[in-house]
Regions:
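Extended active-site and interfacial segments that coordinate phosphate-rich ligands
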Residues: 12-19, 67-77, 135-148
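Dual-mode signal for accessory low-complexity, basic/Gly-rich regions
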Residues: 43, 83-208
Length: 208
């Protein structure tokens, strides 16, 4: 949704149309667009407390998952080289493959015909698996070959707190709806760059 030079965005995906909540998503996008068009402010470069909405987290997470590939791991070009079975995230975060989760639109098999099974990739922040193709799996004796088609990021509180609750407890910060054109700056340490999109707001005293 566009209002002047500002845009707003919201989305949902589910197998059941009754779970899409189209009116709620539409109103959320409209509110963001209108709010973004109201007295925009410019902030100087610096370090800020940042709250990422789920879509923004997903954009960054997709790059992390991409970098879990075994080939670059064994070549030493992965940001996770020599970090298997070590903590790479906050201990309150875990990453699972959950193909049966109703909200993830999972499938029973991959595009290569491999079975998709429930599996653990990061538990309590500790990386315990890599993404193998058939070649690296055979080379390193990986069987069965697990995949990460339906990633589910689980967070314990306060990581799992709702966005509205995070906003209320933030004295000064930035709320990011989404990212666009995310690109790697340095793949070896997973430094990324990108642009915020569809609603970036200043938070002061717990309010946008």
């Amino acid at each position: 949704v566009q209002a002047g030079e500002a845009t707003g965005w919201s989305a949902a995906a589910h197998r059941s149309i009754d779970r899409l909540h189209v009116q709620e998503r539409t109103l959320a996008a409209i509110i963001k667009a209108k709010r973004g068009a109201d007295e925009p402010r410019e902030l100087p470069p610096g370090r800020y407390t940042v709250i990422l909405e789920p879509a923004a987290v997903a954009g960054l997470l997709s790059w992390m998952i991409w970098m879990l590939d075994a080939k670059s791991f064994y070549k030493g070009t992965s940001p996770f080289s020599r970090k298997l079975n070590t903590r790479i995230l906050d201990r309150r975060l875990s990453l699972f493959n959950q193909p049966a989760h109703a909200d993830l639109l999972g499938h029973g098999f991959t595009s290569e015909g491999l079975p998709v099974i429930e599996s653990s990739w990061i538990e309590a922040g500790v990386l315990n698996q890599l993404l193998h193709d058939r070649f690296t799996a055979q080379e390193h004796g990986i069987d069965p070959l697990t995949t990460l088609e339906s990633p589910y990021l689980s967070g314990e509180r306060p990581v799992g707190t709702r966005v509205d609750d995070l906003i209320r407890t933030t004295q000064r910060g930035i709320l990011v709806t989404n990212f666009w054109y995310i690109r790697p700056v340095n793949p070896s340490d997973l430094t990324l760059t990108g642009m915020t999109r569809d609603g970036t707001f200043l938070i002061e005293n717990g309010e946008i």
